[in-house]
Amino acid sequence: MGKYFGTSGIREVVNEKLTPELALKVGLALGTYLGEGRVVVGIDTRTSSEMIKHALVSGLLATGIEVVDIGLAPTPLTGFAIKLYNADAGVTITASHNPPNYNGIKVWDRNGMAYTPDKESELERIIEEETFKRVSWMEIGEVIKADPKKEYIKNAVEQINLENSYTVVVDSGNGAGSIVSPYLQRELGNKVISLNSHPTGFFVRELEPNRKSLDMLSKVVREVGADVGIAHDGDADRIGVVDDQGNFVDYEVMLSLIAGYMIEKYGKGKVVTTVDAGFALDDYLKPRGGEVIRTKVGDVAVAYELSKHGGVFGGEPSGTWIIPQWNLTPDGIFAGALVVEMIDKLGPISELAKEVPRYVTLREKIPCPNELKQKVMRIIEKLALQNFEYKNLIDIDGIRIENEEWWILFRPSGTEPIMRITLEAHTKEKAEELMKKARGLVKEAIEKAKLS
């Protein structure tokens, strides 16, 4: 993790670490790195997004870059617009599922894939050295206003094949997805009921579309007898799903179902996921001809492996999915359309989910200062060896220890000052026993790091 960029671009508290001054420098650095060309810029609904956007755009213009300002736009729309307008890069001003006092800057390449750590490191070098390109008054870039929504919806509809119409409840979480996701479902011929569809930076619910935050969506799906509920985070790069019975579908289960459907739709092939994905995906895909490849957490790592191996699908157990036949940008909106297509072809999710093997997955977050994370991870590796009997240790992203019965992943967040523990076991009792032990281990490591 660099000085500014984490696992998902820059993501910090507004007017503390993420300031207009920093946004200006990022714009200058990106324009300097590109040398010339066109950059698409979109924002989410946060109160600070316009402020950050204008500062960043000023930096781009100062280097002679032409800016295509698409205004309020979910991340998937920015990724789509990069190709639509033949741009050299794109920028989304968003903090995704983080609290409203956060914002962020995420950069995309000309293929719609997030900038790799190497490219972000180059931007950081330019910022630190302040070796910014500055053009003369005659060469300053211009801003072009554009709206790619209709083209996005038109192209998405052409990719989805529905034989029937469905009742779909869409909870946009007051985020940028509210201007696209319900409209795409309607254009597909579905009856749409919208929740939290007014774009605002004062979010009604927690932005992460998980079981806890989607009580209202579950209730509405049950009350109206809907076929499915679709939910998004602030920039709609994620998807959460509620089945036809009004039950939230666990991320791991939904990941397995949609990956299996993509194999059925496009043929046998590789599925890319991250180190925090559990056993279910492997068990579900193996008899269907799917090969699972694991990589670092973050959509850029998934997208890179997809492009490298030619996979049919990539996804994280956080509801972040990449459909390479569509784009290398994580897209919760197009994912929602695919979910309905899966229902159309295979049947209700409540029935499909019964085929996915079930394990007990637990997750916890423990506060940890960013400056201590590296030291804490070194201590965790030593303590894990002393406290757990495991067969394999995987350290491509954090530390994952595992055997045939369970696995535990210790990983520092790349976007927040926390340590994450993710684990899976065959029984609830074993999972809780492992979490108690893992929690104590992380807290001990943090205390030791503070003293050393």
Swiss-Prot record:
Disulfide bonds: none
Cofactor note: Binds 1 Mg(2+) ion per subunit.
A Pfam entry, by short name: PGM_PMM_II
Domain of life assignment: Archaea
PROSITE patterns recorded: PGM_PMM (PS00710)
Residues with PTM Phosphoserine: S96
Keywords for the protein's UniProt record, in alphabetical order: Isomerase, Magnesium, Metal-binding, Phosphoprotein
Role summary: Catalyzes the conversion of glucosamine-6-phosphate to glucosamine-1-phosphate.
Family statement drawn from the similarity comment of this UniProt entry: Belongs to the phosphohexose mutase family.
Protein name (Swiss-Prot/TrEMBL): Probable phosphoglucosamine mutase
Natural source organism: Pyrococcus furiosus (strain ATCC 43587 / DSM 3638 / JCM 8422 / Vc1)
Taxon lineage: Archaea, Methanobacteriati, Methanobacteriota, Thermococci, Thermococcales
